[in-house]
Design a protein with these regions (language model features):
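C-terminal structural segments of small proteins and small subunits
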Residues: 48-74
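Short, exposed beta-strand "edge-strand" segments with a Pro/Gly-rich flavor and a Y/T-containing core
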Residues: 5, 44, 72-74
Length: 74
């Protein structure tokens, strides 16, 4: 993954796994990683993606009603 990436923080592990599956079906380069130490979460994993795909990720999450805490640029 490129240096310019963002992460989606979720409330649950199941939401993170579902988001990963949906994003991969949409042909986006994503992966689940541990939540960075400087960010907090109820869930220990987050979805990493290229920052250029932020709008697409937000659309996928909204269309599929996947709840998330926040999106952070890293």
């Amino acid at each position: 993954m490129k240096d310019n990436y963002s992460v989606v923080i979720f409330y649950s592990t199941s939401a993170a796994i579902r988001a990963e599956s949906l994003a991969k079906r949409g042909k986006l380069a994503v992966k689940l990683i541990p939540v960075p130490r400087n960010l907090s979460s109820d869930c220990g994993i987050c979805l990493q993606f290229n920052s250029a795909d932020k709008q697409k990720i937000e659309e996928i999450l909204k269309e599929n009603k996947v709840e998330y805490e926040n999106i952070y640029g890293i």
